[in-house]
Amino acid sequence: MKSKEILGYDIKEISNQTVEQLIEKKKELQGKLNDLQQELLKRKVEARMGTLKNTASIRNLRKDIARILTLLSIINKEIENKKKESKK
């Protein structure tokens, strides 16, 4: 069975990484998230001004933002689990 991927990140791969690797991925994803949020704001302004030609791009950006937030949630849970395991 093929494992699930979100934005090129394999979910099973995430659970096999160390805490340091997960923190690095988290920082990378937060940077992408900020970039996408700024781009979304820019596109919304363009849409209001009537200069946006591809209105579907707003929907696509919102979906990408949701995917990144999902990944961040998974990574945060995995970091918590690994920290709990290391304390035992």
UniProtKB/Swiss-Prot annotation:
UniProt name for this protein: Large ribosomal subunit protein uL29
Cross-referenced Gene3D superfamilies: 1.10.287.310
GO molecular function: structural constituent of ribosome
Family: Belongs to the universal ribosomal protein uL29 family.
Gene, per the UniProt record: rpl29
GO biological process, one term: translation
Key word Repressor present: no
Source organism, top-level taxon: Archaea
Cited NCBIfam families: L29
Annotated source species: Sulfurisphaera tokodaii (strain DSM 16993 / JCM 10545 / NBRC 100140 / 7)
PROSITE patterns, sorted: RIBOSOMAL_L29
